[in-house]
């Protein structure tokens, strides 16, 4: 069992963020130590939501670490560049621990409107030296300075996933991360994940589910981290994470993407 310090937000509705991290990592046998970066009434895909920022993050971390040592650190949604800078300070003092970063900051080719250029720069510092990171295609482009629109011009080609893999073959050198999984690359009828580890570029693919549910990235990264901490290779952990997300999405009854994927009823797959 590993003690995992989790920096992420929590949402009342959305089945995402810490709402995904906690049950999945616990199911995989790890002790979760959440540091809430922000509390949302509903995830941001809903029209109306209320949010409260954690203005005492550094003090929260100090209180926790005075009583329990963290074996691993997970970084997710960090609200703004100032809060991410605080998290980076914790990371810089914890590089002897296993560091996992899900650099949540954009999708569909755009930086989320609540973030600015400084957030991207701070995230580049957060991923530097991380043991594993799990950006989506947009976030990978932001981290590596790749032109998303030019890359997406190849989307209709049957070799699109391989084109993306070639584009990011030097991603680890560029970002300073030790390994990476570029997640959720849509390729027609299937979804691909690009696994970058030890100089190799490998791929994991699954059938694409027609509804793009909220929180699938959080579910994926939770399984990925949990399995890595159990000693799985990056590739094997990616296989398990991708299969779990696919099965959970296929068995989700609610078709409103905002409520997220119904992963809890599939937790037995992690036994």
PLM regions and their residue ranges:
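Conserved N-terminal subdomain of the carbohydrate kinase-like
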Residues: 2-101, 105-113, 267-270
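Glycine-rich beta-alpha junction loops
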Residues: 11, 38-40, 79, 105-107, ...
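Short pre-catalytic strand/loop immediately N-terminal to key active-site residues, enriched for Gly-Thr
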Residues: 12-13, 201-215
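Conserved phosphate/ATP/ADP-binding segment of small-molecule kinases
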Residues: 114-201
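Short, small-residue alpha-helix embedded
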Residues: 142, 211-240
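Charged C-terminal helix
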Residues: 235-271
